[in-house]
């Protein structure tokens, strides 16, 4: 099945890489500085920006709204609705209102992507999906997706009417965490769903001390983080949202899209970072263990 490419522009390697606003908007006193940071990311070449109503309690959306209101046609904006903000007695209405509030903060009349932030409260999924479908029909969102869903979650979600329109699934699929390669990635490919990774590369420093990763990076004159990201972007039907913490890191992450790993480099990385295809704990078992 053809992979959907929502939020993407015409340059494939650029299109596969987005900027996550996870660390934006926490403090109003930093809004000006963070606005400059986002403008710098745009100047580097980033065109996909992903927020959430929970990032800075809406602050990330506000910063993005100020920065990109005059550049709206040049960027792709997405946000996420949190299950914790959904009223169980008014699921549909809660999602619609949350979307409208995100649109207000983003200073736009539509989002390119709107995502369910996590898989809790699966009994509400049908109504959440109904809201997504109506928001899409009304032109308030261009596409919708899910986040932190494993293969079991996504399989259940896809049984719902209209779920075949799901465009993306966001996960923690990385070089250091390859479990999703066993089941979630094949499922996404079979359904034409784009798998987007949240590597949070700056948070995986221990993996970057690996001798094989460091050797490949040194041979190419780049950082281990760039090699790890290039590995991620080598997979068909996948993308990544990165979380830079400096302008230098922003540039380095964006430059990673130009790195084409050689077959022997991919083989060495795949051998070093094994793919543990173990039976997952079911959602029911996870809940029972809490």
Which residues are covered by each model-predicted region?
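Active-site groove signature of glycoside hydrolases
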Residues: 103-122
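Structural motif corresponding to the early beta-alpha repeats
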Residues: 75-93, 117
């Amino acid at each position: 099945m053809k992979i959907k490419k929502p939020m993407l522009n015409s340059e494939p390697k650029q299109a596969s890489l987005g900027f996550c606003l996870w660390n934006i908007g926490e403090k109003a006193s930093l809004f000006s500085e963070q606005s400059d940071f986002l403008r710098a990311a745009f100047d580097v070449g980033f065109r996909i920006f992903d927020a959430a109503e929970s990032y800075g309690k809406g602050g990330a959306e506000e910063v993005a709204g100020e920065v990109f209101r005059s550049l709206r046609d040049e960027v792709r904006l997405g946000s996420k609705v949190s299950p914790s903000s959904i009223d169980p007695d008014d699921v549909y209405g809660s999602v619609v209102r949350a979307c409208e509030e995100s649109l207000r903060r983003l200073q736009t009349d539509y989002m390119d992507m709107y995502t369910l932030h996590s898989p809790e409260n699966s009994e509400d999924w049908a109504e959440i999906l109904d809201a997504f479908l109506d928001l899409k029909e009304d032109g308030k969102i261009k596409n919708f997706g899910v986040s932190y869903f494993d293969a079991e979650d996504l399989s259940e979600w896809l049984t719902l009417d209209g779920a075949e329109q799901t465009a993306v699934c966001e996960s923690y699929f990385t070089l250091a965490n390859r479990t999703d390669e066993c089941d979630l990635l094949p499922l996404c490919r079979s359904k034409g769903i784009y798998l987007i990774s949240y590597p949070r590369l700056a948070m995986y420093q221990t993996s970057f001390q690996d001798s094989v990763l460091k050797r490949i990076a040194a041979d190419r004159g780049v950082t281990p983080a760039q090699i790890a990201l290039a590995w991620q972007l080598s997979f068909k039907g996948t993308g990544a949202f990165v979380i830079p913490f400096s302008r230098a890191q922003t540039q380095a992450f964006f430059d990673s899209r130009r790195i084409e790993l050689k077959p022997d480099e991919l083989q060495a990385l795949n051998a070093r970072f094994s793919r543990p295809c173990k039976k997952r704990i079911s959602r029911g078992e996870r809940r029972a263990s809490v």
